[in-house]
Amino acid sequence: MMEAKAVGKHLRISARKARLVADEVRGYDYKEAIDILRFTNKAASSMIINLLNSAVANAIQMNESLDPNSLFVKKIYVDDGPIMKRFRPRARGRASRIRKRLSHITVVVSEIEKKVS
């Protein structure tokens, strides 16, 4: 059983929003996951498509005879990254803090187990 992994670090999207998209494709095979992400109208979907393609490319690099259609999304998880703090000027000389959240997304693909009969 072969696994390949791709990690996106410091991606400019909040982990809460990215988890909504990641939960949609967990467990699906590669082609079906790409189709789901293509028709998902969220900013995180394009980031996850890039990571999924990278994980498949990593798997093919490890085993060149591997068929990409025999892979599925074994694990996908989103962790909180650092928070960029910015300030917005407000009335009467005050300022409000703006927290721009970053996230780390990890995608693990694995081969679909073939049943021996």
Curated annotation (Swiss-Prot):
<dbReference type="InterPro" id="IPR047867">
    <property type="entry name" value="Ribosomal_uL22_bac/org-type"/>
</dbReference>
<keyword id="KW-0699">rRNA-binding</keyword>
<dbReference type="GO" id="GO:0003735">
    <property type="term" value="F:structural constituent of ribosome"/>
</dbReference>
<dbReference type="Pfam" id="PF00237">
    <property type="entry name" value="Ribosomal_L22"/>
</dbReference>
<comment type="subunit">
    <text>Part of the 50S ribosomal subunit.</text>
</comment>
<dbReference type="GO" id="GO:0006412">
    <property type="term" value="P:translation"/>
</dbReference>
<keyword id="KW-0689">Ribosomal protein</keyword>
<comment type="function">
    <text>This protein binds specifically to 23S rRNA; its binding is stimulated by other ribosomal proteins, e.g. L4, L17, and L20. It is important during the early stages of 50S assembly. It makes multiple contacts with different domains of the 23S rRNA in the assembled 50S subunit and ribosome.</text>
</comment>
<comment type="similarity">
    <text>Belongs to the universal ribosomal protein uL22 family.</text>
</comment>
<dbReference type="GO" id="GO:0022625">
    <property type="term" value="C:cytosolic large ribosomal subunit"/>
</dbReference>
<dbReference type="GO" id="GO:0019843">
    <property type="term" value="F:rRNA binding"/>
</dbReference>
<dbReference type="InterPro" id="IPR001063">
    <property type="entry name" value="Ribosomal_uL22"/>
</dbReference>
<protein>
    <recommendedName>
        <fullName>Large ribosomal subunit protein uL22</fullName>
    </recommendedName>
</protein>
<keyword id="KW-0687">Ribonucleoprotein</keyword>
<dbReference type="InterPro" id="IPR018260">
    <property type="entry name" value="Ribosomal_uL22_CS"/>
</dbReference>
<comment type="function">
    <text>The globular domain of the protein is located near the polypeptide exit tunnel on the outside of the subunit, while an extended beta-hairpin is found that lines the wall of the exit tunnel in the center of the 70S ribosome.</text>
</comment>
<dbReference type="InterPro" id="IPR005727">
    <property type="entry name" value="Ribosomal_uL22_bac/chlpt-type"/>
</dbReference>
<keyword id="KW-0694">RNA-binding</keyword>
<dbReference type="InterPro" id="IPR036394">
    <property type="entry name" value="Ribosomal_uL22_sf"/>
</dbReference>
